[in-house]
Amino acid sequence: MSEQIRTASVIMAAGRGSRMTPYEGNKTLLPLIPEKSFFEGKEPILVRILQMLPPGPKAVIVNYKSQDVKTLTQHMRVVYCHQPELNGTGGAILAARDFLADADCESVTITMGDVPFVRPESYRRLLETLKNHHMAVLGFIPSDKKRYGVLEISGEKVERITEWKYWRSYPDAKQSSLNICNSGIYAVRRQELLKFLPILESRPQIVHKERNGQMVAIQEYFLTDIVEYMNADGLSAGYVLTADESETMGIDDLESLQKAQELYRKMAVKVTAA
């Protein structure tokens, strides 16, 4: 077995997950083993993620139903970082700035709070990629890439991560060449990440979202922007590709929750049989 690399981990668990209707809780606490209903059971998603991450200090980004998150994970010796506003993945990392500054690790692993099937081996490969790059992105090839952000790659380097709303207007030939999608899971050299946080904070993007039945303009920060900042500064981002897109499956609605619970059941059967 390969030696595990110690890293500081940040898990984004602040959002509500508005598509998970009629569930009213924090979606990272949904069960992988349903009992009374799909929404009640054992093996919370977030706990599974924390168990799979490499060794080292861990911070959970909280906001919505934060006390519920703390209650279910307090036995796991994690740090909680409050994200005052739900203002994007970059906003979540900015909320963890003090944790990152104090972490006694050379690297940082960043993951979403709804992707429970990422294997320890994939985290290790991401961290090993930091030997040659300053940042590493976990990519996957989906059966349908619509709605996903894509990695724009040159050789072994990721030049930028482009969201669906932008790349869908690319010429057909260019669209066809973009096959690797962004999982939202990263490894970054800690000092380089800290260096670019002030730049990220100074460059919010304006997005339009519905709030109380009305479309409003709000400021959000996107962690993916750091890839372009690094490239502009002469640094590089690499990538690692998963073998199976189910490994990076996010759970954001009832259909994906049911798929995840069935996948987890099959995984448990395989382990028992072995």
What are these regions (language model features)?
Residues 8-14, 31:
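A conserved hydrophobic helix/loop-capping motif in glycosyltransferases and polysaccharide synthases
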Residues 29, 151-153, 239:
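A structural signal for short hydrophobic beta-strand segments in well-ordered beta-sheet cores
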Residues 17-21, 146:
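Short N-terminal binding/cap micro-motifs at the start of the first secondary-structure element
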Residues 1-8, 19, 36-128:
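Conserved N-terminal catalytic core of the sugar/cofactor nucleotidyltransferase
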Residues 11, 46, 96, 114, ...:
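Residue-level signal for inorganic ion chemistry
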Residues 3-9, 177-274:
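Conserved alpha/beta core of the MobA/IspD/sugar-nucleotide pyrophosphorylase nucleotidyltransferase superfamily
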Residues 118-209:
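Conserved core of the sugar-phosphate nucleotidyltransferase
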Residues 15, 114, 141:
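Active-site glycine-centered loops adjacent to acidic/histidine catalytic or metal-binding residues
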